[in-house]
Amino acid sequence: MAKEEAITVTGVVQEALPNAMFRVELENGHEVLAHISGKMRKFHIRVLPGDKVSVELSPYDLTRGRITFRPR
């Protein structure tokens, strides 16, 4: 189990980068670099610029995150 719990925030995808990375602007105005979670990759869930997503951030590095959810 993780030592520290992840911080979950919502944001909007600004641009798609190579290697399934995305630049996401969070609600509070910060920009983070995020990759898609394994389950989203497994079920071929598409993420496009302009999509609203949920991002998990590690308390150790708040500049990188994992996209965990994209509402329909």
From Swiss-Prot:
Name this protein carries in UniProt: Translation initiation factor IF-1 1
Listed InterPro entries: NA-bd_OB-fold (IPR012340), RNA-binding_domain_S1_IF1 (IPR006196), S1_domain (IPR003029), TIF_IF1 (IPR004368)
A Pfam family assignment: eIF-1a
Subunit structure: Component of the 30S ribosomal translation pre-initiation complex which assembles on the 30S ribosome in the order IF-2 and IF-3, IF-1 and N-formylmethionyl-tRNA(fMet); mRNA recruitment can occur at any time during PIC assembly.
Localization per Swiss-Prot or TrEMBL: Cytoplasm
Keyword Transmembrane helix: no
HAMAP family reported in the protein's UniProt record: IF_1
Keywords tagged on the record: Cytoplasm, Initiation factor, Protein biosynthesis, RNA-binding, rRNA-binding
Family: Belongs to the IF-1 family.
Residue ranges constituting the S1-like domain according to the UniProt record: 1-72
GO cellular component labels: cytosol
Record's function text: One of the essential components for the initiation of protein synthesis. Stabilizes the binding of IF-2 and IF-3 on the 30S subunit to which N-formylmethionyl-tRNA(fMet) subsequently binds. Helps modulate mRNA selection, yielding the 30S pre-initiation complex (PIC). Upon addition of the 50S ribosomal subunit IF-1, IF-2 and IF-3 are released leaving the mature 70S translation initiation complex.
Any GO MF annotation of the entry: ribosome binding
Cytoplasm listed as a keyword: yes
